[in-house]
């Protein structure tokens, strides 16, 4: 949510920031609503003052036995009372209209975010690792000999439809090992607190984390009104909704491994083969709650936490800074980490690490008490994938594939796989 005071103070800067995202100016329409709302509030306050004055004079007239003045003042009190109610109702309606308009407007990009239209304008920050040099044409994950029988799309389609998969046997175990490895690394090495969170959330949690109203069509809602989370960013971030935190308690660093659900409403025809884009998938999420002056450093810390997972797995990747046209709705700045997929001969997103500034905090009224004793301020919230488990599985399988259809697995997973380090061409761990 945007700070209406900032828009009042510098509407040109607000419109310029929207223009960087390719949006039309909106300050004039917003401020017209704001002015009308404030006028109604002032009218209600003035009418209330007049009502209070008349109420006091009613008593005086009654005590003096002045019935004519008493009746006149009593009628005035009723008139002002009705006017107060009318003005307050009008102000409430205008406030709701203003809030609705603001809730559809994307976050303001940070100054260092590159301007651009789409992913072609993103800026590469760094690369890590050597791309594997195969003496054969590498296959996509679902075509690899040891994988094909354990990645069952047909049975999943029979039970659930398109964009679902049933992982079986050794591949299911590798998938589970990856999620455990990620959580253990974040808790034991990165100092995050593990949370086992709900995956069903209320409207307030979706709104507070900027998923409503913008992304209603991309999400699944149950018949009794709960929403299935598209990311555990939602329940993790919303843990501080309505709170006033002590500065000494910050930063708060959380992680969770959950199922996630997305309708992929805008992805028709994209990545239809394999398990790269699914309606149901698993992800390990990181969330940080910080003081404003710490959020930029915290974003870099979270980025390194995500990159470290890939480095421990030995998976080549590149990190890119997203341009204004490719950045998500709630983000002020986003870094994407893209893992190398030999089967596609391309880097594909495996993590996004974003800072939202106080955009989400304003929506959910999450604040902290500064150490100097000043008035409560809004916290900053950050989120990042650490990592998308299914996409990490794809990267492990494609980068480790061998000519005979087997897959050499990252050594760091051996402890989760009973000491086994290879997925055989027959689909067993050896």
From Swiss-Prot:
Domain of life: Bacteria
Binding-site residues, L-serine: 231-233, 285, 385
Name this polypeptide is given: Serine--tRNA ligase
EC number in record: 6.1.1.11
Biological processes annotated in GO: selenocysteine biosynthetic process; seryl-tRNA aminoacylation
Residues bound to ATP: 262-264, 349-352
Family listed: Belongs to the class-II aminoacyl-tRNA synthetase family. Type-1 seryl-tRNA synthetase subfamily.
Lineage: Bacteria, Pseudomonadati, Pseudomonadota, Alphaproteobacteria, Rhodobacterales
Record-level GO cellular component terms: cytoplasm
Organism per entry: Roseobacter denitrificans (strain ATCC 33942 / OCh 114)
Pathway(s) annotated for this protein in UniProt: Aminoacyl-tRNA biosynthesis; selenocysteinyl-tRNA(Sec) biosynthesis; L-seryl-tRNA(Sec) from L-serine and tRNA(Sec): step 1/1
Keyword Protein biosynthesis: yes
Keyword terms of this UniProt record: Aminoacyl-tRNA synthetase, ATP-binding, Cytoplasm, Ligase, Nucleotide-binding, Protein biosynthesis
Catalytic reaction annotation: tRNA(Ser) + L-serine + ATP = L-seryl-tRNA(Ser) + AMP + diphosphate + H(+); tRNA(Sec) + L-serine + ATP = L-seryl-tRNA(Sec) + AMP + diphosphate + H(+)
Gene Ontology MF terms in the entry: ATP binding; serine-tRNA ligase activity
